Amino acid sequence: VPNLTGRTTNDGFTAPEDLTEEKVDLHSEEYYKMVQRSLMNLGNTYRIRKVIEKARAGKEVTLAFIGGSITQGAGAVPIHTECYAYKAYQLFQKRFARNNNVRFIKAGVGGTPSELGMIRFDRDVLREGEQPDLVVIEFAVNDEGDETKGDCYESLVRKVLKLPWRPAVVLLFSVFANDWNLQERLQPVGRQYDLPMVSIL
């Protein structure tokens, strides 16, 4: 049995070792600059504005997050309330909600690429007739083994964009150890559809 301590494999891709990082100072100038750089593309904000208007009007709004382990909450303690998805939901609720009218769907499953995301979207997000108003898609790490080289990712994006209630879509490019991701491969999809894109690089 090979020694795999501290390493993960995915379709022949060997992930870099997980290095312990220092705590981030959320009030530092470096952190502020990183956040400023994170918006790769503002895109067409029409659908997002509609979601915000709906929330401010007191109507029920559903935010959905689909992706891999980062969306699931890997590294967050506790996993369900300290993950980026829940933090984004809380911030949206605080800034735009009226009377707890914002709902939350977290469909993150570790190790899954957008190929499975296509199937999981129906099962994990649209279950029981859900109609999310905003969908964040995060597969920038797990799609390394995607033999379609981004076609499944684009198919998932198109699937969400074509839903009859026209949800807003945001593409999130999270990172693995050593600040690695596939945003160079996947960002053309966001540019093609003029979508908001956020990078953690």
Task: Place the predicted regions along the sequence by residue.
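N-terminal secretory targeting modules
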Residues: V1-I66, T71-I79, Q90, K94-N101, ...
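Alpha-helical cap/lid subdomain in secreted, periplasmic
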Residues: R56-K59, E82-L201
